[in-house]
A protein has these predicted regions:
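Local sequence-structure signature of Cys/Sec-based thiol-disulfide redox active-site neighborhoods
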Residues: 1-5, 78-112
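Structural micro-motif
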Residues: 22-41, 130-142
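Thiol/disulfide oxidoreductase modules built on the thioredoxin-like
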Residues: 127-136, 146-152
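Oxidative protein folding and maturation machinery
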Residues: 1-32
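Long, charged amphipathic helices and adjacent flexible linkers at domain junctions
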Residues: 65-80
Length: 162
């Protein structure tokens, strides 16, 4: 289903290309990147339901579409002095998850030292059990739990900017 989704999206525009040569350890998964760059935004599982908007926004923002956040917050994201991989575990029926996924995607898009991966817990039950995830969204930075539940972009950036 993921290959089908990615192929369909690529067929909608000549500005989108689908490649199937990734080496992400989580399968099924895919990354989103500007042409010529390595992906920093990843989706592990099928981003449907509430997460479909997260995928569309990632495609738009990677291509240069300006996000609806202040210049101050964007500059703060660009200035974050960190190298990090963020994982956010979600459920496709979760109402709070897209805001957190979209915030972390934006951080990965605007700060080249970061990556963000949305992980659909339904696809990765072993990892959910191993990390003892009982509620979503649950966020990890370099495999260390840093937050869960509803969080705004500004709250996440403030937490990272300490």
């Amino acid at each position: 289903q993921i290959k089908e989704l990615v192929t369909e999206i690529a067929e909608l525009s000549d500005k989108v290309t689908a490649r199937f040569d990734g080496n992400n350890t989580r399968r099924p998964s895919f990354g989103v990147a500007k042409a010529g760059e390595q992906p920093r935004v990843f989706f592990a599982g099928l981003p449907m339901g509430h997460e479909f908007t997260s995928l569309i926004l990632a495609l738009l923002q990677v291509s240069g579409y300006a996000p609806k956040v202040s210049d101050e917050v964007l500059n703060q994201i660009k200035g974050l002095n960190l190298k990090a991989n963020f994982d956010v575990f979600v459920s496709l029926s979760c109402h709070n998850c897209p805001d957190v996924v979209q915030a972390l995607n934006l951080i990965a898009i605007y700060n080249p030292n970061t990556t963000a991966t949305m992980i659909d817990g339904a696809f990765f039950q072993d990892e959910v059990e191993q990390r003892k995830i009982m509620a979503v969204p649950m966020v990890f930075q370099d495999n260390e739990h840093i937050g869960q539940g509803r969080m705004t972009l500004e709250e996440i950036v403030a937490k990272l900017d300490t």
